[in-house]
Curated annotation (Swiss-Prot):
The keyword Methyltransferase appears for this protein: no
Pfam families documented for this protein: Chlam_OMP
Membrane found in the keyword field: yes
Record text on subunit structure and interactions: Part of a disulfide cross-linked outer membrane complex (COMC) composed of the major outer membrane porin (MOMP), the small cysteine-rich protein (OmcA) and the large cysteine-rich periplasmic protein (OmcB).
Keywords recorded for this protein, A-Z: Cell outer membrane, Cell shape, Disulfide bond, Ion transport, Membrane, Porin, Signal, Transmembrane, Transmembrane beta strand, Transport
Signal peptide: 1-22
Organism: Chlamydia trachomatis
Transmembrane segments: none
The protein's role, per its UniProt record: In elementary bodies (EBs, the infectious stage, which is able to survive outside the host cell) provides the structural integrity of the outer envelope through disulfide cross-links with the small cysteine-rich protein and the large cysteine-rich periplasmic protein. It has been described in publications as the Sarkosyl-insoluble COMC (Chlamydia outer membrane complex), and serves as the functional equivalent of peptidoglycan.
Name under which the protein is recorded: Major outer membrane porin, serovar L1
Coiled-coil ranges (or none): none
Recorded GO MF terms: porin activity; structural molecule activity
Similarity annotation: Belongs to the chlamydial porin (CP) (TC 1.B.2) family.
Superkingdom, taxonomy of origin: Bacteria
Length: 393
């Protein structure tokens, strides 16, 4: 049985190293792997011994914590209906722009994100008790990247406006939704922290069964927003938008004169519980574990308008191309805006984990019972790699 357990853990650790989410599982035997310190010798006392003091029971570890999520499995967390203008029904020509919102099927409902990445570098600090329990925290910085279909971000605009003017009416609302485009965003590098606890619950020879619980939080700002859409393509550096505001947006939305806007930021929260089994083989301690986690990315459903000019130049305020191929903007004529997309905007919808369960496989290398390096990969609910290097005082 021992040989079988050794074979399974070693094979899993080595074979997974070639395939690289945001909280690692960690080695379940970590609280008891480093039993000696660089400044103070370890003490393996009995907690029931009346002569044992808390000074003998407590030790500290510090080190580097790196977690690199290459693809988190996310989906949107939105309502089934979305308020915007009625869908156009005219077969030819233009029509009056809608001025009232109606409930339509939300194209963002249940959408899967194409890519979600997060990279964290932090300092790791752990308080160890009786070489069996760890209470730890990380303090560092994180940055992220999100990419998805434009429908996931409720990219909308107004098409076919029959007005004879260089701007749309004040009460006009969008009537078209885009689902054949791509939206991507990059966040800045911002402060991130996490706390957790880990315990070696059961030991039998060289095998250890352990459990852990962790919570992480960060709130990065959106550094750059790219909308890759043939009808309305644009890029915004440090975008700002409206929170809690329904259509119609102000006519100044997207211009330098816009008011009532705030910086776009994403509030990230995640909790995770895990159970793992390890087996020590001299310097190496491979392990395999399962985890249950829930992550949320909430940007307050901020709505960001396409950048445009406050006053028209050459009878246009944006560089959006013609849709039906008119080839020119006819000034002082009905429908002069009808062939280009107007009042384009999108919103950053709340996202959550699409899968809750995942597996983690890794190994820890211990040197002189004072130093340790852990390498881990995680699969199913995310694809990620984790590195932890630490020493005991």
């Amino acid at each position: 049985m021992k040989k079988l357990l050794k074979s399974v853990l070693v094979f899993a650790a080595l074979s997974s190293a070639s395939s690289l989410q945001a909280l690692p599982v960690g080695n379940p035997a970590e609280p008891s792997l480093m039993i000696d310190g660089i400044l103070w010798e370890g003490f393996g006392g009995d907690p029931c011994d009346p002569c044992t003091t808390w000074c003998d029971a407590i030790s500290m570890r510090m080190g580097y914590y790196g977690d690199f999520v290459f693809d988190r499995v996310l989906q949107t967390d939105v309502n089934k209906e979305f308020q915007m203008g009625a869908k156009p029904t005219a077969t030819t020509g233009n029509a009056a722009a809608p001025s009232t919102c109606t409930a339509r099927e939300n194209p963002a409902y249940g959408r899967h994100m194409q890519d979600a990445e997060m990279f964290t570098n932090a300092a790791y600090m752990a308080l160890n008790i009786w070489d069996r329990f760890d209470v730890f925290c990380t303090l560092g910085a994180t940055s992220g990247y999100l990419k998805g279909n434009s429908a996931s971000f409720n990219l909308v605009g107004l098409f076919g406006d029959n007005e004879n003017q260089s701007t749309v009416k004040k009460d006009a609302v969008p009537n078209m939704s885009f689902d054949q485009s791509v939206v991507e965003l990059y966040t800045d590098t911002t402060f991130a922290w996490s706390v957790g606890a880990r315990a070696a619950l059961w030991e039998c020879g060289c095998a250890t069964l352990g459990a852990s619980f962790q919570y992480a939080q960060s709130k990065p700002k959106v550094e750059e927003l790219n909308v890759l859409c043939n009808a309305a393509e644009f890029t915004i550096n440090k975008p700002k938008g409206y929170v809690g505001k329904e259509f119609p947006l102000d006519l100044t939305a997207g211009t330098d004169a816009a008011t009532g806007t705030k910086d776009a930021s994403i509030d990230y929260h995640e909790w995770q519980a895990s159970l793992a089994l390890s087996y020590r083989l001299n310097m190496f301690t491979p392990y395999i574990g399962v985890k249950w986690s829930r992550a949320s990315f909430d940007a307050d459903t901020i709505r960001i308008a396409q950048p445009k000019l406050a006053t028209a130049i050459f009878d246009t305020t944006t560089l959006n191309p013609t849709i039906a191929g008119a080839g020119e903007v006819k000034a002082n004529a009905e429908g002069q805006l009808g062939d280009t997309m107007q009042i384009v905007s999108l919103q950053l919808n709340k996202m959550k984990s699409r899968k809750s369960c995942g597996i983690a496989v890794g190994t820890t290398i211990v040197d002189a019972d004072k130093y340790a390096v852990t390498v881990e990969t995680r699969l199913i609910d995310e694809r990620a790699a984790h590195v932890n290097a630490q020493f005991r005082f």
